[in-house]
From Swiss-Prot:
Biological classification of the source: Bacteria, Bacillati, Bacillota, Clostridia, Eubacteriales
Physiological role: Involved in the binding of tRNA to the ribosomes.
Keyword Ribosomal protein attributed: yes
PANTHER family in UniProt: 30S RIBOSOMAL PROTEIN S10 FAMILY MEMBER (PTHR11700)
Name of the protein: Small ribosomal subunit protein uS10
Amino acid sequence: MKNQKIRIRLKAFDHQMLDQSATKIVDTAKRTGAQVAGPVPLPTEKSIYTILRSPHVNKDSREQFEMRVHKRLIDILEPTPKTVDALMRLDLPAGVDIEIKL
């Protein structure tokens, strides 16, 4: 697997769970002999939703909710077959979305 790169993008609502998952991936890749670049923090997506508090009147009374999506990027340079096998067996939390590109 020479001259290849694995790019892993992680997304989660909870930044602590995201950082724990990123450190697990980095430790696993380094333990199997691959070079790792990252985790690189990407910009946080922030979505704000404004709704009326009452169901009928009072347009002045509103409530705002926000949803933040935190993201990290990890590049694994020159992965070995042992690295790919270890990453496939890695157990990560359910709240983290993982996108892998070769």
